[in-house]
UniProtKB/Swiss-Prot annotation:
UniProt lineage: Bacteria, Pseudomonadati, Pseudomonadota, Gammaproteobacteria, Legionellales
Single Gene Ontology MF annotation: 1-(5-phosphoribosyl)-5-[(5-phosphoribosylamino)methylideneamino]imidazole-4-carboxamide isomerase activity
PANTHER family: 1-(5-PHOSPHORIBOSYL)-5-[(5-PHOSPHORIBOSYLAMINO)METHYLIDENEAMINO] IMIDAZOLE-4-CARBOXAMIDE ISOMERASE (PTHR43090:SF2)
Gene encoding the protein: hisA
Annotated metabolic or biological route of this protein: Amino-acid biosynthesis; L-histidine biosynthesis; L-histidine from 5-phospho-alpha-D-ribose 1-diphosphate: step 4/9
Cell location: Cytoplasm
GO biological process, one term: L-histidine biosynthetic process
Catalytic activity field: 1-(5-phospho-beta-D-ribosyl)-5-[(5-phospho-beta-D-ribosylamino)methylideneamino]imidazole-4-carboxamide = 5-[(5-phospho-1-deoxy-D-ribulos-1-ylimino)methylamino]-1-(5-phospho-beta-D-ribosyl)imidazole-4-carboxamide
Record family assignment: Belongs to the HisA/HisF family.
Protein name according to UniProt: 1-(5-phosphoribosyl)-5-[(5-phosphoribosylamino)methylideneamino] imidazole-4-carboxamide isomerase
Keywords, in A-Z order: Amino-acid biosynthesis, Cytoplasm, Histidine biosynthesis, Isomerase
HAMAP family: HisA
GO cellular component: cytoplasm
Amino acid sequence: MLVIPAIDLQSGRCVRLKQGRFDQVTQFSVFPIERALHFAKLGAKRLHVVDLDGARSGKMQQLELICSMQKTGIPIQAGGGIRSIEQALECSSAGISQLVIGSLAITNTDLTIQIIEKIKPENIVLALDVRVDTKVPLLAINGWQNNSTSSLWEVVSYYENYGIKNILCTDIACDGMMNGPNFDLYQQAVEYFPQIAWQASGGIRHMQDITTLGSLGISAVILGLMLYQDNVSFEELLC
């Protein structure tokens, strides 16, 4: 299983949101490039970077900073406001390893398909963030500010027809809470779509959570707030 550190950016700083709420932001003193270099030295194989300003505004705001983070040598999967072919191509040309497409996959399927065809499916990660309502995982969009009526299963089934294999799924209720991930959700995801390389995010607390997710068939975990805790060794998580 791949262990991927997450770096969320807001106004050029490293931050974390609680349950995706922009009014519950924790800002960290470390600078993003220093944070990326730190993970590079510890042996990280990939970084997950989110431009929260872009996710909220609908247009990526911090591509220059993300490109600077790439100079650490770690492949980056990045998203937050990629909502046009032009911006997708700009990110790809800048060397971003995989583009993370979120809200657009729900709000504009035609444009998303065009991006997939231009960039190639293997270079895309669909980020599908859900709120579980009466056991049905419904998707949230626009930096989690709005809810959609589309279910996770409907959207995955649709894009699978276009070659998408990499999907990052977050249960918003777990994100930033450090109470554990939604194991039932990920178990269902792997059972319904075993051919998808699922990435799990939200609520992961310790090595046992990661081990359990691996036993369910999850391909990668995204670690955010957990890696800011003093008692967590990223090097040990890689072992």
